[in-house]
Amino acid sequence: MNRCSKFIIFTLTVAGGFCFSTSAASVTNLFGFSGKEIYPIDQQISNLHVADLDGDGLNDLIVVNNLRSKINLLYNLTGKTNRTDTATTKKLELNDLPPGSRFRIDSLPTEQRVAALIVADVNGDGRPDLVYFGDAKDLTVRYNLGTNGWSEPKTWHLDSGRLDPNALAVGDLNGDGLNDIALLGDNGAVHFLAQQKDHTLAEPVKISYSGTPKAIQITDIDGDGKNDLVFVDFDSPTPLRVRLQIAGGQLGPEIYFKTQPIRSFWLDTLAGGTTNFLVDIVTATGRAEVSQFTRQPAEPLAGKFKQGQLQILPLNKSTAGTRGVLWADVNGDGRADLIVAEPESGQLSVYLQQADGTLASAKKFPCLAGVSQIAVADWNHDGHPEIFLLSRDENAVAVTQFDKNGRLPFPTPLPLDGKPIALAVGALKPGAKPTLAIIVDVDGVRSLVTRTADGKTTTQKLSDSFKSNPTTLVIQDVNQDGLADLVVLIPYEKIKVLLQKKDGKFEEVDVDPPGGVMEQPWLAAADVVGDGKTELLLPQKNFVRAVVLEPAAKIPGATNAPAWKFTVKDQINGSASDSRIVGAATVVNGTNTVPSLFLFDAEHKQLTLCERDAAGVWQVVKNLDLPVTTFSAIQSVSLGGAAVAFTGQNSVAWLPLGGNVWKLTRLDDYDTLIKNGYLNDVVAGDLTGGGRKQLVFMETGKNYLDLVQFSAAGKLVPGDRWQVFEQHTFRNSQNGLPEPRECAIADVTGDKKNDLIVLVHDRILVYPQE
């Protein structure tokens, strides 16, 4: 065994030291490294961390040792004169540290294979604790008791936790100055454990996310002194998503940043200030890039429109077939708010719009379970809107409104004979108070029930052939006679129109939609011909048609009343023949008489802006790429200015048509000078003592460390590089892992100069800085 250990040490020994000159970056500092120190531990050690565990002013090393089901703690003994390990008669086992080593190795047992480890103070006592998560799905905290003592494990079982070193993060995420814990889950949410004022950890709560991120990080992206939550999906064309921390310690919506797919990343204040930079390695090219987060005015779009910041708000995941989601003013302040049903928990989440156009954090109120539809209107014109909720689970329609204390009381069910299947609310005649319209089912017989705020109710039986369940009920004057009608959308069926007659009753007609029936029907309304009247917008795959319901030509000699048909007034095409338009919204652009039209193209993941040209023909003006398309509808909404809002089952989003935007601005890139080299990972740290940080790339094709300077001009300047080992000389090196696989930059020699600590094969290498 001793011979094998010596052989391994010999083949890894590099004669002499290394010197790195940063003169090319106009920096005069020189730094170099003496020959490396080698500390064998075990195969497959991982999760390298550096921290002063025992408070002696010296940095210690921590690694996960899953082969032995333990976490190894390497206590730093540099300069200590009271050591007890300098002489021993004990025979050294393989990978034992010899007497006189810089580190004394200790360990803590684990009851699981640890996937992620963070070393940080999570109880406010100033001592770094151990936070880890593994295959037993237990988030575990071992508190540092000082004097090399550790608490018993405190665990939280989290079945959906992701088994990945990048899935765990620690930092102050709610602005109270205390470190919190975040664990990325595979179920659409982050498990968040806030540190409380008594320094205990609260029970986990979920922070929803969109997409399928593989990593999280807590860091200050925008330099405002507050930590933000970063999501990374390496293989996505928008790998980086950020939720900025806003007032009150809340997290804002997600902002997506577009780059190429990446294999690794590093976020750091490379210039020594508060500005965070992103260093990433592009998957396709292996080229390293450095970018900066910048705030810029939105680019012009068309007319008064500018392309603002698309913001995505993930909702609590729901597996219900449908859930109620609506943009509407619910507190009477004239601003559109967001109301979201939580079908499984029987709650209503309300996001009130603030004066600056942002949404406050959600307030939850109890309501009916299984709410699938929501409607809002000031039913009695008292200035306080009512919220109407339809629950098929409870076979009820109920109403509630905010009280003077800002509370939403439990909804009051409305008297109803039968099962409600669709509802809408709005004025049926010009100037009238809103009427609640409900389609109900009583033992297979469908009826229309209308109810006003004073309790007046009417019921009208509908056709016996009406058996299918509608997805949408809309109040809209489809024949432009000044009386509001009811439009019922049913998958794979004709459009059912309840035409209002002068006596207030409704004529039930079924009309073929232009282009045929649809699997997922939808509609919108807009004046697209400029005559001051609103047309119905109906989709036909790659275009929408503006239609008006008109009587069909009467057949000569026929005695029946003429049938009804949709007459096409105009057509607006998407950007391509294979476009799939699933939503449309109109927004007034400056002083234009006819509003602009936005089409949601799900096939191309685009929002298409269309406008009428001088000849009155609709043209595509601009296609805006969307990082997320899991939405089912769009509409115009005012959020401190004009915006297009998106709604979906588990997320909503909005695109302001103005304002400033965050962008990821690329500063420079770097191709390794190592022939056929493969940059796999990167870390950063200050190796000169000047405040600016250098980059250390782990090159795993030829097993090099590749050092690069980040210059004051924002450029990546090549420095020194050396081979950590030669693959063919290393015994048992075929472990399938990239080498060198982890690296840290910290002072472990006690001379106030940062050293290089590298994890390779079964050992830790330390390159002391000269």
Describe the role of every protein-language-model region.
Residues 20-770:
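Beta-propeller-forming repeat regions
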